[in-house]
Amino acid sequence: MNIILLGPPGAGKGTQAKKIAMRYGIPHISTGDMLREAVAAGTELGKKVKEIIEKGLLVPDDLMVAIVEDRLKKPDSAKGFILDGFPRTVQQAESLSGILGNLGKELDAVILIDAPEEVVVERISSRRVCPSCGKVYNLLTIKPKNDMLCDDCNIGLIQREDDKPATVRERYRVYMEKTAPVINYYSEHGSLITIDGSLDIEAVTEEIFKNLENL
């Protein structure tokens, strides 16, 4: 099954992608994770990505398309995939269509997990990360056992620059400006499924599986 997950940052795409991946035995391909790995590696590409992310801007289309194309060519994507965080522009959506055509694949579903700005800001600004092992916590839902310390490393947790409220609001603004047209693009192609992302995690999962089983 070939699936795209759309929605604003903080809507819960990553959480739901992992559940779908486990159920259908397909890889969860998160462009966000791939970009953060580049930043952590400290390469020239990573430095460029870091600067873009910290400003709350979108990574250029040509860079994202190249990253995704390479990933979809890997053997574990042969039976399907879940794309989380891509496409974010209509140009990326059109490029993806070309990539899939070349690989002999078609999209089965485009799932939009929608959530309002205030929900997004509250969720993301509550995230904390261990600078050593990279484990992610949330002060609302996945709290550390000891106040502001990693359960595994006992090191003080930090707030990533792109998780701070001002940056989150800018990311949401950019999302609405750039990604909303992608929703219209897939809506016109008849493959869009909209889910209320302000619901709790279990309710969102139930709605997603209900829709996928009816395809």
UniProtKB/Swiss-Prot annotation:
UniProt-listed Pfam families: ADK, ADK_lid
Annotated residues for binding of ATP:
G10, A11, G12, K13, G14, T15, R127, V136, Y137, L199
* Reaction equation(s) it catalyzes: AMP + ATP = 2 ADP
Residue ranges for the region (LID) are 126-163
Q: What is its EC number?
A: 2.7.4.3
- What positions does the entry give for AMP binding? T31, R36, L57, L58, V59, G85, F86, P87, R88, Q92, R160, R171
The record's CDD domains line, in alphabetical order, gives: ADK (cd01428)
- Residues annotated to bind Zn(2+): C130, C133, C150, C153
Give compartment(s): Cytoplasm
Renumbered residue ranges of the record's region NMP: 30-59
**Pathway linked to the protein:** Purine metabolism; AMP biosynthesis via salvage pathway; AMP from ADP: step 1/1
Q: Does the keyword rRNA-binding apply?
A: no
Gene Ontology cellular component list: cytoplasm
Record keyword Zinc present: yes
Q: Which GO terms describe its biological process?
A: AMP salvage
Q: What's the entry's take on its domains?
A: Consists of three domains, a large central CORE domain and two small peripheral domains, NMPbind and LID, which undergo movements during catalysis. The LID domain closes over the site of phosphoryl transfer upon ATP binding. Assembling and dissambling the active center during each catalytic cycle provides an effective means to prevent ATP hydrolysis. Some bacteria have evolved a zinc-coordinating structure that stabilizes the LID domain.
Per the similarity annotation, which family is this?
Answer: Belongs to the adenylate kinase family.
Subunit structure, per the record? Monomer.
NCBIfam families with a match to the protein in the record? adk, PRK00279.1-2, PRK00279.1-3, PRK00279.2-4, PRK14527.1
Q: What is this protein called?
A: Adenylate kinase
